[in-house]
Swiss-Prot record:
DNA-dependent RNA polymerase catalyzes the transcription of DNA into RNA using the four ribonucleoside triphosphates as substrates. It catalyses: RNA(n) + a ribonucleoside 5'-triphosphate = RNA(n+1) + diphosphate. InterPro entries: DNA-dir_RpoC_beta_prime, DNA-dir_RpoC_beta_prime_bact, RNA_pol_asu, RNA_pol_N, RNA_pol_Rpb1_1, RNA_pol_Rpb1_3, RNA_pol_Rpb1_3_sf, RNA_pol_Rpb1_4. NCBIfam families: rpoC_TIGR. GO terms for cellular component: DNA-directed RNA polymerase complex. Binds 1 Mg(2+) ion per subunit. Zn(2+) 2 binds at C816, C890, C897, C900. The RNAP catalytic core consists of 2 alpha, 1 beta, 1 beta' and 1 omega subunit. When a sigma factor is associated with the core the holoenzyme is formed, which can initiate transcription. It comes from Neisseria meningitidis serogroup C / serotype 2a (strain ATCC 700532 / DSM 15464 / FAM18). Zn(2+) 1 binds at C72, C74, C87, C90. Mg(2+) binds at D462, D464, D466. The lineage of its organism: Bacteria, Pseudomonadati, Pseudomonadota, Betaproteobacteria, Neisseriales. This is DNA-directed RNA polymerase subunit beta'.
Amino acid sequence: MNLLNLFNPLQTAGMEEEFDAIKIGIASPETIRSWSYGEVKKPETINYRTFKPERDGLFCAKIFGPVKDYECLCGKYKRLKFKGVTCEKCGVEVTLSKVRRERMGHIELAAPVAHIWFLKSLPSRLGMVLDMTLRDIERVLYFEAFVVTDPGMTPLQRRQLLTEDDYYNKLDEYGDDFDAKMGAEGIRELLRTLNVAGEIEILRQELESTGSDTKIKKIAKRLKVLEAFHRSGMKLEWMIMDVLPVLPPDLRPLVPLDGGRFATSDLNDLYRRVINRNNRLKRLLELHAPDIIVRNEKRMLQEAVDSLLDNGRRGKAMTGANKRPLKSLADMIKGKGGRFRQNLLGKRVDYSGRSVITVGPYLRLHQCGLPKKMALELFKPFIFHKLEKQGLASTVKAAKKLVEQEVPEVWDILEEVIREHPIMLNRAPTLHRLGIQAFEPILIEGKAIQLHPLVCAAFNADFDGDQMAVHVPLSLEAQMEARTLMLASNNVLSPANGEPIIVPSQDIVLGLYYMTRDRINAKGEGSLFADVKEVHRAYHTKQVELGTKITVRLREWVKNEAGEFEPVVNRYETTVGRALLSEILPKGLPFEYVNKALKKKEISKLINASFRLCGLRDTVIFADHLMYTGFGFAAKGGISIAVDDMEIPKEKVALLAEANAEVKEIEDQYRQGLVTNGERYNKVVDIWGRAGDKIAKAMMDNLSKQKVIDRDGNEVDQESFNSIYMMADSGARGSAAQIKQLSGMRGLMAKPDGSIIETPITSNFREGLTVLQYFIATHGARKGLADTALKTANSGYLTRRLVDVTQDLVVVEDDCGTSDGFVMKAVVQGGDVIEALRERILGRVTASDVVDPSSGETLVEAGTLLTEKLVDMIDQSGVDEVKVRTPITCKTRHGLCAHCYGRDLARGKLVNAGEAVGVIAAQSIGEPGTQLTMRTFHIGGAASRAAAASQVEAKSNGTARFSSQMRYVANNKGELVVIGRSCEVVIHDDIGRERERHKVPYGAILLVQDGMAIKAGQTLATWDPHTRPMITEHAGMVKFENVEEGVTVAKQTDDVTGLSTLVVIDGKRRSSSASKLLRPTVKLLDENGVEICIPGTSTPVSMAFPVGAVITVREGQEIGKGDVLARIPQASSKTRDITGGLPRVAELFEARVPKDAGMLAEITGTVSFGKETKGKQRLIITDVDGVAYETLISKEKQILVHDGQVVNRGETIVDGAVDPHDILRLQGIEALARYIVQEVQEVYRLQGVKISDKHIEVIIRQMLRRVNIADAGETGFITGEQVERGDVMAANEKALEEGKEPARYENVLLGITKASLSTDSFISAASFQETTRVLTEAAIMGKQDELRGLKENVIVGRLIPAGTGLTYHRSRHQQWQEVEQETAETQVTDE
């Protein structure tokens, strides 16, 4: 026998078994009894005098085991030698006391009780199985009604409910011919007598014969539950309990406090209540008490058990002495403080500490300063070991003493221990994987951790009192992973976008910018130097200044054919500072990268180039040197802020006067009634917005240039050396918007609801604010702070949902071999290329050959990873679109393949197997969310709103073409007025390639013609941004219909002007029901008073006024084509901010149907309008075969198509927000992906955040992972059920192999919350949200969790199947397969 096992009796053979899956089910009464070590009969806990557990009570030692190790309760048997003996006096087995954590007991219930989860967790499972309503079942269970369990020969129905009076009447009538019961017994009887297999047959037949949709849904649901029971072999009556398991006592402890009181777990109270009621019920049954008393006791028992299992699920929650609800078993596992999230997914760890961080500017990138005191504590065991090994201490106790006395040898040993032993630093909140990085510790005095300044960006740390936690990786493997994967110097690129995240900021940028700026006519200008050393000497002897323009010979290193560096000497026109900087450049980085004023963007490009050209190691060293240099020169520069640096532009007074005059003019127009109040407000806001911008521009022009005398004595402009300007220009701190507030004007402010206050703050911070101005300013500033707090929570929750939906997505194979993919084009908006094609395809794998459009030769073959070189080549050849692989179309079943994902952004090469790309995607999208939410208040609530666009201009020369949907009429002034809803002007270059595309709104005036040659900067069209006009396409005399004052239109008289206008009233607000359907319209008459018809038809022209329209024509007025009939004022402009942004991202990922969604054409065909019904318009689309599709559209909606127009399937026909589900259904997966990626990117772009499209695609893949079975074929699925895409694919392959009919399915788009909850793994779903519901469902289905994802493995305490853990899982899997093969072979040989 193994000696080691003597001391660990618990490690019996069964404990250490490896498992591959976890199955959940409903426990049968026999199972519960088999777990139990005895029945708990008394509600007592412990004897309050002796503190010993009461016999047969909730803490009984006989049932649950001894209180002290190897000692029975009465003390007859003590010590290890009696191990395993059961004391005959007190009945306690002598063993370890920790069995009290694992031995369960049970309570035999005197009456059966329904399990509340199966009753009340919606939809009620009991109700589904029995086909009864929840209300009915509850009436039976809580003793309000009888249920007929066996009607016998009587006309009663099975499952019929009878009230008490009914029951006694029927008893008198039929005698014992029928059975009816009350309470859980009745329900149990019904469940026991239900023939599951027979019921399934009946339901399947019904499913085929029925036609109604609701019925099919209902049957399918019942079928699913019943089939699950049938498959798993669980019995229906197990949902009703006869016997209740009792939790081991150490998991619900009773702790004596000082002063004779006890602290107890709520569960003990709940169990006591159950036992008390159960015992009382037993006694009443023995005494044959009257029915009514027994019934009441049974009901109370049912309620007690309900509270124990899930308190508060039904009725009022049971409360303890202090009036708060007791914590039941269900509460123990759910929510943030429950078992899953508190103890399984987030544990506290040993060997960790935390302290404040300070800056360590002398550190190297892979180092951090660790206070000696902390190191001593963290590395204690290692030090003890070393002390014993070196013979300085004979025992651990002695070593401990030495460490406590801090003898000198201890410090030497600490140095030794720490050498080459990385530690991990973490800053909360850890929003992405760079929130934990490994460093080599350097021992320092003091109590603060020193952090390298360049990693601050990754941690989002600053030194204003932030704290960080230290963790020590103990095992060799952990140290190795920390060093190779997590060391700060190995994490130069951001996983979100593949750009460097180790980028200098603030003082470093300022120093580098200062040293690389040039000054005109500085000391020693025009000197020639032989090499950098000479420049050094000249600089140190003050012959030249830092910004002096000089010519110098520089030696650069260039790679030759063989890949070796050889020196090349060139002469450069440069400055002293840049020449000095050239010394720290790594080999292979050309001097031209630093031969300019280095701003933050340039430095970022510099580090990026260094990484691509010189590799990781050189880049890290280079970054460090940049930092030291930057700090040094920032100190030498002595750049500071003074009041005089804030120069107020002289033009300010004039500009303000001009704006005030304009505002006065608008006010006058408003008084005359030419504009509405809303328009006036919008225009005033616009004027002030523009005025602010003009003042800001004047101020920046003033700040950025200064006059100097050059060498020849002429006065010239040079870039300013104003400190504030330099800080903003270099990107070190501040921005033009902030300088504008310091020395321009503060500008417009926002109210807390986001609308803009029309009186701006005209003064700036240098002049100071008046009391009123200060008061206006406080609004925005406070809102900013309040927003921040709310949004941080929102953003964290979004990240949590994203991580949850993608956590099991890991790269598992190299190539799935698909040739599917998406076609990538450059993103163009309004003629600006927002994202070039090269940016979008860099680091992707091509799905098909890339062909040169001019020569037709293949540039890049399919299946190639596009590197910078290849992308440049594609860019130069003028290719417009490239088809690339994408995670969405990857065919790998559980996980992704490397080729569909492409480049690992943080490493710059093809992604490795085992990379957890799902989690990285979730972090990359979630992390900036929090950053953005926090970035609202930095401008101090100043309204940042783009002045509304009122025209479009061409950006380049070319030819203007109108899109196919373009419709316009010429008005009597000869202007072309746009009357189409989705019109675009496209500009083609000389070869005919599309260069720009501009949307032109309805009612715009076109200033160009189709096919006209245009120049860059030419205006293409103009319009009024604040109102939408309503324009007539025909000429004639106005005749109103249903335009009745006080019924359909209201006369609005303006208080200020006294003028009145007619405004259309919203139908819902009209008084009588008849008037609700009336539609104010305008018809046109010719000179004879006959209605004018649409040319070529007999339909009279009739145009309806939309709600809120201000009618501008009068009855009987003559109008011409293109004239305005009415104006619809646009809502006032709110500030655009990520506030609208973060919820927008969440809305997209949750795939919510927007409030007033637009409509897409269901089929391709021709549009016509049918008869109106109930105030709705009937729109008909007829396809080529004459099949018509009809839809009703409410009057408020704006229809974008006209009679006779041809539309394509999926084209927008009714204005409104697009519903992503429609896009998926009508245009397919690629269109949907493009839409979501575009919309999400738009939000982030607005904030200047770069995220790779890949990450969004990874999440879309997870949103599309389930499909709806449209026709099950011969695959065994149920029509209409939702299943994993992979499962259908596998089933279809199998069906085709066997020659059966495969299933047809439709794609389904799930929001991220739903997708997380619908995952195959119930452990992952339960730990996410709605724990009770998930577990109830899983138990009924008898689900098995294969532990495929990361989360499940974390919860069961294994290595995750990603990264280095993937190999562990794979090898386990292989061993398991080998064992299976061997057993199979042995069986064959046996036979």
